[in-house]
């Protein structure tokens, strides 16, 4: 006689970008094992494959394509799936800012971690009086690379590559140039032709992009100094 099947609980959350309700379930043991083994390998390709596989399996709402979600939606979703799977309280060790060496243990409730939206954030960038650029958020692959890439590389080249993948289109009143129709070399040359002011506007897009963020207060047990620490991005909470 076959063994009975264990009922898996389901949960709902709202995607920060659209407010759309998404049903999901926790990791199963086999999926958690897959993630742990991938993280222990410190191999970015293995981690990418594992996170993609787990997110696709755990998201139950039809029509949700994980690969197309904004980075901050992916972070928020992954954090909550992990919370329902291994515990909704995260235990971290924070280095006190005042002496930069003393570690303090803290506990954070997953529900207290929000995606912060900056009012100055914009996906539209004015390059000159006639030309505009529209940016898009990093892909799932870029998200994983930024959070879990253990390989040292040329930071400048990586930055240019990231920016290039986030340019959706360049347009004016008469024409639209979609970067999907361009080569990486053409996009890179276009970026290199910008002046400093234009490039700073692109940097501002990334600096103000919605992100997981949580502010905590820590007191250094040695100096008794209380400091505020801002934790940003999934990697800060992935301990």
Label every model-predicted segment.
Residues 1-239:
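Long C-terminal interaction/binding lobes of large macromolecular proteins
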């Amino acid at each position: 006689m076959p063994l009975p099947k264990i009922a898996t609980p389901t949960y709902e959350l709202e995607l920060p970008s659209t407010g759309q309700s998404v049903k999901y379930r926790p990791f199963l043991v086999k999926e958690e094992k897959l993630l742990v083994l991938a993280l222990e390998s410190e191999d970015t390709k293995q981690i990418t494959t594992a996170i993609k596989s787990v997110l696709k399996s755990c998201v139950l709402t039809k029509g949700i394509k994980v690969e197309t979600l904004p980075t901050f939606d992916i972070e928020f979703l992954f954090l909550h799936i992990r919370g329902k799977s291994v515990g909704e309280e995260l235990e971290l060790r924070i280095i006190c800012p005042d002496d930069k060496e003393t570690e303090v243990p803290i506990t954070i409730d997953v529900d207290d971690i929000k995606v912060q939206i900056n009012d100055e954030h914009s996906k539209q960038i004015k390059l000159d009086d006639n030309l505009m650029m529209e940016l898009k958020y990093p892909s799932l692959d870029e998200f994983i690379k930024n959070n879990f890439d253990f390989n040292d590389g040329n930071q400048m080249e990586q930055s240019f590559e990231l920016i290039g993948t986030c340019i959706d289109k360049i347009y004016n009143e008469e024409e639209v140039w979609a970067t999907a129709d361009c080569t990486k070399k053409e996009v890179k040359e276009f970026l290199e032709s910008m002046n400093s002011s234009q490039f700073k506007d692109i940097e501002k897009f990334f600096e103000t992009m919605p992100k997981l963020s949580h502010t905590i207060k820590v007191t250094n047990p040695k100096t008794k100094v209380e400091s505020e620490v801002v934790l940003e991005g999934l990697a800060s909470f992935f301990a």
